[in-house]
Amino acid sequence: MSTIQPSVLRRQAGDMLQKAPYDPKRLVLIHTSVALGASLLVTIVNYILNQQIAGTGGLSGMGLRSVLSTVQVVLELAILVGTPFWEFGLLFAALRWARGEKADFQNLLQGFRRFGSVLALRLLRGGLFILMGIAVIQLSSTVFLLTPFSKSLLEVMEPVITAAGNPQQLEAILTPELLVSVMEACIPLMLIAGALYALIALPVFYRLRFADFAVMDGAGAVSAMVQSVRATRKKSLQLVKLDFSFWWFYLLQLLCVAISYGNIILPALGITFPFSEDMALFLFYVLGSLCQLLLLWQYQASVLTCYGLAYGAFGVRPPTPREQSLPHTATWNA
């Protein structure tokens, strides 16, 4: 298949999921419940620990505060580090659904079984985007300073530069109002940087879009990136079209996130609550999590299976046993 059609993929995904031996929605429900449950548990424990830390004062409580703070950091790191590997397990399940194979709870642990390759892929890809960000900052700063857009910033900073040798005068100038003026003057810089980063990073993002599936297919990190780049050559726009066909799904995900932060968003709009801030935090977090659980339970299996079908349609094939023993060998079915 040289061209993918979102409507065809959705129909094929529906057929595959109906024939699945183990209910895909049930598997997604288990996967999402574990992820949201762990996050909720850590949030509750952190709240309790914060109350304990606030109740310890003076030098006598310093040791206890240090221990409790360490526990908080460890719990947050565990969620931060573990969640991506858990998410990769569902990608592996989606790949099996797309191939008409059985996927069960054991497959959700595949991300941890492929720990080294998944970690290497995330580090390589993250490092690549960080380097692009640094390059964009340098380029956008140069463009900003060499154009009339920087005039406002130079005018705002002129008194600061003039008073650089006078600490008292400098202290009088450095006010919150000056900071606001600097931020407003930097808006063109941020717009230039955002536009340049999107121009550079988006094509790279789509060329590497199938690297996650390739890693779950047995490839090494470098091999997965190379396979994805080759398979999406001249086909990235098809992936963009596929993404846009699921606009409603991503919009509902954003809505779930917005609900989770309702305790911040609604007061900013002038809406007050008849209960405490802590209660508002807990209620909106639980409500947002429940909305996300329902959304993913209903639709995520279908969406991920569509991407799994696209992965196969783009000609990214599973590596042979010999290629799996050589994780840095690029493979691609031309």
Which residues fall in each region the model found?
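Hydrophobic alpha-helical membrane segments
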Residues: 1-334
